[in-house]
Amino acid sequence: MQIGIIGAGKVGCSVGKYLQENDALRKAGYHITGYAGRRKESVEEAATFTGTTPFYLLSELVKKNDIVCIATPDSQIKTVWEELCKFSLEGKIVCHFSGSLSSDLFTGREKKGVSACSVHPMYAFSNRFTSYEQLNTVKLTIEGDPKAVAVFREIWNLCGNETGVVSTGKKMQYHAAAAIASNLMIGLYAKSVRLLEDCGFAGEEAENFLRPLVENNIRRMLESSPEEALSGPVERNDAETVQKHLQTLQGSDRTVYLALSEEVLSVAKKKNPQRDYRELERLLREDRRQ
């Protein structure tokens, strides 16, 4: 099956290069043909980088390919789809790579004879020409029509990547989970740095003090489980310390501490099912109501 990519940015270049270089994929009959996009220069750079063809007309890319991948920014995907609908799409598979948008974006696809899906690599692309080198370790989540999902699972599994399937209705929740693990964790770290700065630590000094703690805890969690890695006042049922923390924190710092302590309490209960956390649970619940 021939695969064309619309969009020659970080995602388009990285995915195209990675798939193009995979021998198992080529042997299975999948081939990247080339790129189309708004900027001629970017399209030509992507085609040269991947050893494929620059398509200067969208109609030519559509005509040439069985699978059309939209690798544009989220705000442009709907517009690209509307442009695609001007051409014959019968029997084709269309996908986009947005993490937050679902295949519902491809309105009217049934009438066009299209099978569609969204494919989201759990990875933060940082460079058009080097990010592909890390894609062999990336997991991907696929959502959409059964035929399209099956084809893209085969494509990525042939490359050795693990894939998961999420329902259309859960796509935004899935993306929120990824954002919490990736983006919001950075915000949490930045908040900790700022609190230490308020205690008199300089910015770099605060980070140097926190770094071993963060690295060791994340390593333990990833190598074992959240339950095994968990320690601290909530885990050991130290309601007095938790109460003092809440008394010293203000505003959003206090709100975040309270919300995450409730989540950590759920983990602590799994780790220590014999321990009575009712006093701590009552403290967090009553504090949240204030």
Residue ranges and their predicted role:
Residues M1-E60:
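NAD(P)+-binding Rossmann beta1-loop-alpha1 motif at the extreme N-terminus of oxidoreductases
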Residues C13, K17-E21, T48, E82-K86, ...:
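Short, well-ordered alpha-helices that flank and scaffold nucleotide-derived cofactor binding pockets
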Residues T33-G37, V94-F97, I142-E143:
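Short, hydrophobic beta-strand segments that form beta-sheet elements in well-ordered domains
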Residues R38-S42, G99-S102, P146-K147:
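Short, polar loop motifs at secondary-structure junctions
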Residues S42-F49, G113, T130-E223, E279, ...:
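Internal alpha-helical scaffold of NAD(P)-dependent oxidoreductase catalytic cores
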Residues F49-T130:
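Rossmann-like NAD(P)(H) cofactor-binding subdomain of soluble oxidoreductases
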Residues R219-R275:
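Interdomain hinge/lid region at the active-site interface
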